[in-house]
């Protein structure tokens, strides 16, 4: 995955998310040069402790499950797999494993609230990173890993499978197929040219409450994290502090015979790293989430509830910024029922 997955793990660590050690090495087998390989860390105790966490179980879904998650395939925790199974099945560790497994199972079955089961700040950061870097493969339910933090009793994401797919080429003014969508576009206004499957559908568990209404707390966190990772200060600092490493890695990739990902096939292709592409992506996201308009009267509602004037702001999903009410004029002596402004 060229340098994209390396950036993915580095940015995850930058935001306090558990990220894998990931580097590039030249491989020779029995004296035969095999070219450049990516070396990726596994999911052991060392990963957790290096990330300054208490040792806890890490879960994944069976890789062979359909990518059309979140669908009808989730029935119970038989779909879950824990790393270092022998260790966690020991008598002295089993209670932590059981508690964690039950909580994750109940969350996916809709019996546990997001805030009670997941560290929402870490997950909002993780989704924001995947939006910025186009690493949507890492947001699939079967791709991301779930670390149970026994201190807070909640799950954190472990960055994994941060693959930037073939339908996310570098920005170019002549490229009419440039993908400017973010996760909310997929969930509410998605274009099947860019998201032909339903693999991100499970993220509704983050953005919608059980009554299918917007989870405003998580939504606000997600927008805050998007603002952070797309800010000029964050992106420039992140890239400039790693400029030497980025140049070294790309020089090795450019000199290697790399294969291009065509989803179902692979073959020779063209790759180059573009800082301007990331800068354009960040600007595109900022524009989306800051969109303001005064032309949505049907989405603002006012009324009296418990002797208080209540202004309700209804989110219109093709725009992500809150609608700001700058002035309220009441032309009635009394408000007897809810009246739309």
Q: Where does each model-flagged region fall?
A:
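Short, hydrophobic/aromatic beta-strand segments
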Residues: 318-327
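Carboxylate/His-rich catalytic cores and anion/metal-binding grooves
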Residues: 28-29, 50, 54, 145, ...
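Middle-to-C-terminal accessory/interaction subdomains
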Residues: 91-98, 102-135, 139, 153-318
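Surface-exposed patches in mature extracellular/periplasmic domains of secreted proteins
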Residues: 17-26, 114-117, 144, 233-238
């Amino acid at each position: 995955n060229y340098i994209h997955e390396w950036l993915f793990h580095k940015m995850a660590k930058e935001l306090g998310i558990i990220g894998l050690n990931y580097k590039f090495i030249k491989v020779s087998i029995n004296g035969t040069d095999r070219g450049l390989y990516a070396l990726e860390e596994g999911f052991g105790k060392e990963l957790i402790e290096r990330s300054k966490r208490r040792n806890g179980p890490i879960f994944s879904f069976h890789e062979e499950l359909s990518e059309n998650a979140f669908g009808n395939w989730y029935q119970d925790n038989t779909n879950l797999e824990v790393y270092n199974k022998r260790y966690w099945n020991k008598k002295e560790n089993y209670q932590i494993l059981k508690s964690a497994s039950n909580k994750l199972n109940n969350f996916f079955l809709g019996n546990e609230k997001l805030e009670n089961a997941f560290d929402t700040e870490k997950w909002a950061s993780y989704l924001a990173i995947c939006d910025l870097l186009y690493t949507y493969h890492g947001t699939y339910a079967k791709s991301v890993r779930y670390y149970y933090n026994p201190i807070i009793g909640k799950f954190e994401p472990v960055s994994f499978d941060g693959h930037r797919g073939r339908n996310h080429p570098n920005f170019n003014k002549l490229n009419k197929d440039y993908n400017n969508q973010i996760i909310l576009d997929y969930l509410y206004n998605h274009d099947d040219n860019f998201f032909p499957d339903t693999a991100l559908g499970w993220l509704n568990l983050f953005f919608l409450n059980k009554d299918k209404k917007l989870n405003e707390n998580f939504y606000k966190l997600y927008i805050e994290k998007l603002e952070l990772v797309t800010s000029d200060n964050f992106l420039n600092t992140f890239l400039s502090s790693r400029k030497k490493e980025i140049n070294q890695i790309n020089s090795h990739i450019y000199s290697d015979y790399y294969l291009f990902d065509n989803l179902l096939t692979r073959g020779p292709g063209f790759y180059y790293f573009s800082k301007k592409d990331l800068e354009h992506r960040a600007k595109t996201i900022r524009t989306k989430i800051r969109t303001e308009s005064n032309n949505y009267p049907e989405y603002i509602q006012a009324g009296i509830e418990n002797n208080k004037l209540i202004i309700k702001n209804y989110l219109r999903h093709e725009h992500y910024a809150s609608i700001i009410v700058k002035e309220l004029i009441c032309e009635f002596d009394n408000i007897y029922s809810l009246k739309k402004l």
